[in-house]
Design a protein with these regions (language model features):
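Conserved ABC ATPase signature
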Residues: 141-145, 149, 389-393, 397
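ABC ATPase NBD Q-loop/coupling interface
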Residues: 67-82, 326-339
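Helix-to-loop junction immediately C-terminal to a conserved catalytic motif
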Residues: 53, 317
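The feature captures the beta-strand-to-loop junction immediately N-terminal to the Walker
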Residues: 38-40, 302-304
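H-loop/switch region of ABC-family ATPase nucleotide-binding domains
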Residues: 201-202, 449-450
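Conserved ABC ATPase "signature" region
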Residues: 119-137, 370-385
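Catalytic Walker B motif of ABC-type/P-loop ATPase nucleotide-binding domains
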Residues: 166-169, 414-417
């Protein structure tokens, strides 16, 4: 077997930290294998992915012990540019990996940096667009396509140099089912070509039938390993006991259908919209919406990427003007400014909302109920990070910090935009329980999500938007 990944007694500790994030990792991955590395937020998944693609220790520095090879590149010795033709990476947030403003230029970018001839570049773009079924996206403005479409372009761009190893780091966390299905087809395409694929993921259901081995990371160590057939035999209870998400979502999808557009018996609603049209001048996204939301209730807002869920959230919080229609609060017309004063929104990209130099200061910034700080830190498993800089945390941990800020804000309306995108099963459950507690404050709570496990269990009612 040709070894594409080999870690022998690998430990890694970032500079200025007191503990190693990877501890005595031993793992070998053969050519053509597709493996999935799972584990709770902060278990070391992102750190290991950075070791695989050379970002650590070349760019994000730290102390490396043991030996690690990606293909024939030895970590700590090979320069970062040597990894470019060997390893392709696709990350959780496609915005962080786009370098141009249109899709053609985005796909051309990797080859342009090698000095390839323009005719060859055009030929490779056409070949890959056809192979990965993204011809319809060619020539589009990056800023005018959905999150799922951006992720597909990022996926194709990562493969333009035909790397021997592809790393997928939480690539489905912000995607709807249609977009996940497209990503799955792309991965299957590469697997059939014999490419080595390493998937880091919380959402496991889409990987059924793709993955050859499942690896569990826990506090920086590999604690369990299963061949695919053995992993698929684990019950939902056993998966949850390991802190992992469900492999079968049929039950959750049936519950969502049951909660979908349930008739409301109340006549008077806390927040309501009539004939609301939203979007941008000359470009309406949604038209003639009639919606209602009640205090003390969690409403899930579902729908495919690009349907206008985030645009609706921006409008309801006063961050964006509506095109037409009216919004009411307790049956009285409410202004854009008043909506902003009443609301708090946890954005999909939490990095826009982190300002302070420690987790504690971040959560207390604008807090109306600072006396509950310790309780919230404990509930979201953040106590040990209270003195850490928020930007030094994993994506899932950052997500929990912003959620904590929202919970202490004391606002009358809180909107969460994809709040569990980087969260494992345990922390998704913790967040759900906090939503349940938040209902006692009689706030209007809206959760924009693709997370079927969250929506089915913790949302009282569900509204689905369609294109």
């Amino acid at each position: 077997m040709t070894e594409m990944i080999k870690s022998k007694d690998v430990s890694f500790q970032y500079l200025h930290t007191s503990e190693a994030f990877l501890k005595e990792i031993n793992l070998t991955v053969g050519k053509g294998e597709c493996i999935l590395i799972c584990g709770e937020s902060g278990s070391g998944k992102s750190t290991y992915s950075r070791l695989l693609n050379g970002i650590s220790p070349n760019y994000i520095e730290g102390e490396l012990a043991g030996e690690h090879y990606t293909a024939n590149l030895k970590a700590g010795e090979a320069e970062i540019e040597a990894y470019v033709p060997v390893v392709g990476s696709v990350f959780q947030n496609p915005k962080t990996q786009h370098f141009t403003v249109d899709t053609m230029s985005e796909l051309a970018f990797p080859l342009e940096n090698t000095g390839a001839h323009p005719d060859f570049i055009r030929e490779k773009i056409e070949q890959n667009a056809t192979a990965f079924n993204v011809e319809h996206l060619l020539g589009r403005n990056i800023f005018e396509i959905s999150g799922g479409e951006k992720q597909q372009i990022a996926f194709v761009a990562a493969n333009m140099l035909e790397p021997a190893v592809l790393i997928l780091d939480e690539v489905t966390s912000n995607l709807d089912q249609e977009a996940i299905s497209r990503i799955r087809e792309m991965v299957l395409n590469l697997k059939e070509r014999g490419q080595t694929i390493i998937i880091f993921e919380h959402r496991l259901a889409w990987t059924k039938g793709l993955v050859d081995r499942y690896i569990l990371l826990d506090q920086g160590r590999i604690t369990k390993e299963w061949p695919a057939d053995e992993f698929l035999e684990l019950s939902t209870g056993e998966l949850h006991g390991l802190g992992l998400r469900s492999m079968d979502l049929d039950k959750q999808r049936k519950m969502i259908q049951k909660k979908l557009n349930q008739p409301k018996n109340k006549i008077n609603h806390t927040l309501s919209a009539e004939n609301l049209s939203i979007g941008y001048p000359g470009y309406p996204v949604l038209s003639d919406l009639d919606l209602s939301f009640d205090a003390g209730e969690v409403t899930g807002l579902l729908g495919p990427n690009g349907t206008g869920k985030s645009t609706l959230a921006n409008t309801l919080t006063g961050l964006q003007e509506s095109i037409s229609g009216q919004i009411y609060w307790n049956n009285k017309k409410i202004t854009k400014k008043e909506l902003t004063q009443k609301s708090y929104m946890v954005m999909q990209d939490m990095n826009y909302q982190l300002f302070s130099d420690s987790v504690e200061n971040e959560i207390l910034l604008g807090a109306k109920h600072p006396q509950y700080l310790d309780q919230i830190l404990k509930a979201l498993n953040l106590t040990e990070f209270r003195d850490r800089h928020p930007m030094s945390l994993s994506e899932g941990q950052k997500q929990r910090v912003v959620i904590a800020s929202a919970l202490l804000s004391g606002k009358e309306m809180i909107i969460f935009d994809e709040p569990t995108s980087g969260l494992d099963y345990e922390h998704m459950e913790r967040f759900g329980k906090l939503l349940n507690d938040l209902k006692k404050s009689k706030a209007v709570i809206i959760v924009i999500t693709h997370d079927e496990e969250l929506a089915s269990k913790w949302c009282d009612s569900i509204v689905k938007l369609n294109k």
